């Protein structure tokens, strides 16, 4: 959607006609929308988000946004999960707090098999450093990490959850971002 308000909304833009009308006509904004995929911008995550850009036409009255505004072209940087994973030397061999328990791992495997037998797609997802991308990091990740588990078979261990720093990197936070909170649960809830 560019320029003047249109009554037919494109199927790939999940925004109501009322919201578009309010932005473009009532508030006199030039508005454009686009769905962007995180993986196209260097984040190894299979996540799409709607971005909305708006400019006040009264404030920018001399600008023809239909011809001036251009969305940035995604660099389509080749990504892999290994780019955001901690160096194994930073995760102590004795520090297994990110490795899931045997009980949880057995439960994940059992539920995945049950759902597979029913024809459902539910189950944990296992990734390694060569994986091009992960699933979307959910708000409930702190509970069991099932949507993104890191394979540790080469270390003879059960899978592990991402560390909080890895979660920050996956979401595109810079290295300077301070990962801090009262508890591990609160840290994971930041992402």
Residue ranges of each PLM-predicted region?
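Class I S-adenosyl-L-methionine
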Residues: 1-136, 140-142
């Amino acid at each position: 959607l560019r320029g003047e308000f249109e009554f037919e909304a494109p199927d790939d833009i999940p925004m109501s006609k009322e919201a578009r009308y309010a932005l473009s006509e009532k508030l006199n904004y030039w508005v454009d929308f686009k769905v962007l995929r995180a993986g196209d911008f260097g984040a190894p995550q299979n996540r799409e988000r709607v971005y909305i850009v708006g400019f006040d036409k009264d404030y920018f009255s001399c600008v023809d946004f239909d011809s001036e505004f251009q969305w940035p072209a995604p660099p389509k940087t080749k990504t892999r999960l290994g780019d955001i994973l901690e160096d194994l030397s930073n995760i102590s061999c004795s520090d297994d707090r990110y490795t899931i328990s045997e009980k949880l791992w057995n439960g994940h495997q059992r539920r995945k098999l049950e759902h597979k037998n029913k024809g459902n797609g539910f189950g944990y997802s296992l990734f390694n450093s060569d994986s091009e991308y992960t699933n979307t990091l959910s708000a409930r990740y702190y509970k069991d990490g099932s949507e993104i588990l890191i394979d540790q078979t080469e270390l003879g261990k059960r899978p592990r959850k991402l560390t909080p720093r890895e979660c920050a990197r996956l979401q595109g936070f810079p290295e300077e971002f301070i990962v801090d909170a009262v508890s591990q649960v609160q840290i994971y809830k930041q992402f």
